[in-house]
Amino acid sequence: MRAAPASALAAALLLLGGCADLGYYWQSASGHLSILRVAKPVPAWLADPAVSAPLKAKLELAQRIRRFAVAELALPDNASYTAYADLHRPAAVWNVVAAPPYSLTLKSWCFPVAGCVGYRGYYDEAAAKAEAEAQRAKGLETAVYPVPAYSTLGWMNWAGGDPLLSTFIGYPEGELARIVFHELAHQVLYVPGDIVFNESYATAVERIGGAMWLQREASEAARSEYARFDGQRQQFRALALETRRALNQVYESAQAKAGDWSAVDAMKKAAMDTFRERYASLRAQWQGPRQGAYDLWVARANNATFGAQGAYDDLVPGFEALFARENRNWPRFYKEVRRIAALPTMEERRNALQTATGLLQTNSSHDDNNNGGHGA
């Protein structure tokens, strides 16, 4: 995913009639099924004279990307991304994340199949905001953010798979390729309850695969457009990583251990002020329509947003190094990732990844925190 699998799987949820939280599971099941109901095979959209030429071009591009994913990245060849759904809304789901005032550790929610993760997804934005408000009332910092895509991990291929969605079909070529590669990567493997491992792995697949697509298949214009887009993203992620580290230092400081919360609040404010000042400097250097792409994220930044972002970044260098170690051979890479994924604990998986790649993973958000969400 480019987003995590933000809803529990519809097929499983329909079996949960005895759960205390039946209302939530029902909205998850009915929300996903509502997407499947409006999805139509891509050829039907292409044959419809009422469909605009730009949308047809994007759908054709998405089919090329899907074929590339299967042929060049050894990703699953199934029903996913062979249909398209126009949702008439800006997001597939809205994720809620929450964290304490002095920690980047996200609150966990537990679901069938997905395990315990640091987010809760809603198909209705108002419901997501209500959940965030409920968590705020408990003293947590919260965030609600739109998710353009999620994966059903291959469980819904019998029902047509995961469709292309209007929420991301208009993305620039390189980004469209990355989101398809990311979501298909989740169908290769998924470790219940370890969102940092899952999202870092899928992000590594999308980055490596996206670079391959751009080099081999994209036009010079598409490569140039993507270079500008990704350059800004990498600068922002680097700044956010430094800020996560700074915040963790604050929350692990002597003042925090002594319970001097006035001092901790002052240090936290200083770290956030520095983040926003440095972002303003970065933004002033950027050009083009995406100059203000992160403005809202920065304005709302808190422990929850920083904690969520860590899931997509923290272990990526290890997976990229593992791919290089396996001679850039996708089947060998997936086999080794499966071996590591089969280890029983998060700590063992992190240690195995470090040993396999010779890298010491240094990150700001304590990988065992089950962080989740859609990275910036």
Where are these regions (language model features)?
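C-terminal motif of bacterial Sec signal peptides marking the signal peptidase cleavage site
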Residues: 15-18
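Bacterial signal peptide processing site
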Residues: 20-23
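Amphipathic alpha-helical packing elements
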Residues: 29-69
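Solvent-exposed, acidic/flexible segments
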Residues: 35, 48, 55-62, 121-128, ...
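Acidic/histidine-rich, surface-exposed loop or edge segments in extracytoplasmic proteins
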Residues: 36-53, 109-117, 299-301, 317
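Acidic/His-rich structured neighborhood in mature extracellular/periplasmic domains
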Residues: 65-233, 248
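Pan-zinc metallopeptidase signature
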Residues: 241-365, 372-376
